[in-house]
């Protein structure tokens, strides 16, 4: 268990929320070693969803960007029996498929704290590791990319970075 604080800023009629945790977010640089980065962004993703009921904020859509927030659609599935989260949709945007948030399967399982059901080859498991972006792609309601041509390219073996099969299977939700 880690401390999780939230700060807010009101500017030009829009409220911005910031997740606080000194262990994960007080370092000299935003990215460090992959295992720490995976842990940090899993913590952030879980915090985002956990804070929504506390804030009384129920979005229609949560827009996730790259592997750093790809655990959100996975966690949202684990909350499916909670009426607060019913009907919330997710969009997963991929900017660069090369960066996937891959790390040790047991390390990711431990950090996420969810059941083995989510760690199979059609979900988070990826060649005996875990892949956060793969999980986000598997569970997001819609998948977007930086361009229509990139959406096509990543569905090929040449540019699909090992995920072209899943992306092709999700092609009806990919743009």
Regions found by a protein language model. Give the residues of each.
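Catalytic cores of nucleotide-sugar-dependent glycosyltransferases that transfer UDP/GDP/TDP-activated
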Residues: 1-175
């Amino acid at each position: 268990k880690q401390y999780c604080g939230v700060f807010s800023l009101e500017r030009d009629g829009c409220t911005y929320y910031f997740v606080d945790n000194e262990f994960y977010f007080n370092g000299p640089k935003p990215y460090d070693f992959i295992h720490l980065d995976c842990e940090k962004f899993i913590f952030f993703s879980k915090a985002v969803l956990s804070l929504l009921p506390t804030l009384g904020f129920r979005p229609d859509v949560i827009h996730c960007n790259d592997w750093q927030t790809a655990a959100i659609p996975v966690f949202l599935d684990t909350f499916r029996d909670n009426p607060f989260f019913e009907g919330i949709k997710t969009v997963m945007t991929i900017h660069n498929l090369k960066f996937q948030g891959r790390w040790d399967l047991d390390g990711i399982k431990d950090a996420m704290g969810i059941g083995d059901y989510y760690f199979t080859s059609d979900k988070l498991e990826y060649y005996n590791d875990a892949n956060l972006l793969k999980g986000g792609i598997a569970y997001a309601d819609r998948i977007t990319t930086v361009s229509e041509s990139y959406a096509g390219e990543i569905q090929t073996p040449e540019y699909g970075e090992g995920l072209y099969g899943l992306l092709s299977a999700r092609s009806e939700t990919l743009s």
